């Protein structure tokens, strides 16, 4: 299954540090198109780096670029992410206490929140906090801890942060009818789980490329989600599926 393959592939790359594409194609008996999709998921999360003819594992002990992790991903589907951010921001009301997840899509919300009043934004993402620093109309609370250099987020035992949220805006690597919501970072996944359980309303922010994708870490079931915010109408399969789950689709 896709879920198990991606998990095994990432473990294999981590163990060997550098692997050629031909080796991955042969070992996992997949097409080049499937390999490219899997590697893109890993690359988007900063887990690997692509090199000519193969990949290398992104060991966190290596030096960190002066460019923020969020900035590195800014160019991927940027127009779609901006659109999703605008839709999500329209849901925020004066007086809300919200959680904004890491990721460039959730970050775009802030571009459309300059006129809100008495809104508290809680996040574990350094880039989100740096943007809020320039927005005096918002109160920012940073969920501190140990920083992850590859994602620019802080991780810590989530039980130390028992905040209650009126709304949570969560990013995801994959949306699947069979595996629900998945990502490729166990620490981030644990934070997402905790926030979703503490929030009155949960919104998933995902562009069209995230549908029918299964990453190796499951972090939430659809029963806890109020709406999926995306950039275009998904396939009828997903339209019917979300309707059956009473989840609103916004696009």
Role assignments for model-derived ranges:
Residues 29-30, 247:
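A short, charged, Gly/Pro-tolerant segment at domain boundaries
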Residues 78-81, 122, 184-185:
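A conditional alpha-helix N-cap/helix-loop micro-motif detector
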Residues 11, 21, 50, 127-251:
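Conserved phosphate- and dinucleotide-binding cores of soluble alpha/beta proteins
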Residues 112-129:
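Catalytic core of membrane glycerolipid acyltransferases/transacylases, capturing the structured
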Residues 104-107:
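Gly/Ser/Thr-rich loops at beta-strand to alpha-helix junctions
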Residues 2-8, 14-22, 27, 33, ...:
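HTH-adjacent hinge/linker in prokaryotic transcriptional regulators
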């Amino acid at each position: 299954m896709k879920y198990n393959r991606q998990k095994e592939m990432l473990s294999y790359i981590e163990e060997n540090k550098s692997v050629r594409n031909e080796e991955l194609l042969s070992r996992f008996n997949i097409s080049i198109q499937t390999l490219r999709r899997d590697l893109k998921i890993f690359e988007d999360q900063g887990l690997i780096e692509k090199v000519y003819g193969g990949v290398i594992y992104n060991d966190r002990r290596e030096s960190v670029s002066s460019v923020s992790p969020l900035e590195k991903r800014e160019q991927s589907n940027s127009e779609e992410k901006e659109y999703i951010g605008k839709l999500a921001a329209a849901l925020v009301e004066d007086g809300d206490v919200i959680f904004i997840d890491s990721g460039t899509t959730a970050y775009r919300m802030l571009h459309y929140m300059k006129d809100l009043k008495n809104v508290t934004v809680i996040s574990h993402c350094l880039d989100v906090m740096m943007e809020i620093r320039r927005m005096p109309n918002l109160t920012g609370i940073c969920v501190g801890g140990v920083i992850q250099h590859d994602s620019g987020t802080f991780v810590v035992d989530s039980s130390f942060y028992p905040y209650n949220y009126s709304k949570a805006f969560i990013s995801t690597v994959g949306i699947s009818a069979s595996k629900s919501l998945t990502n490729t970072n166990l620490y981030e996944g644990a934070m997402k789980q905790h926030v979703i359980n503490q929030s009155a309303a949960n919104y998933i922010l995902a562009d069209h490329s995230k549908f029918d994708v299964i990453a190796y870490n499951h972090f939430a079931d659809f029963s806890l989600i109020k709406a999926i915010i995306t950039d275009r109408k998904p396939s009828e399969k997903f339209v019917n599926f979300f309707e059956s789950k009473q989840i609103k689709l916004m696009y």
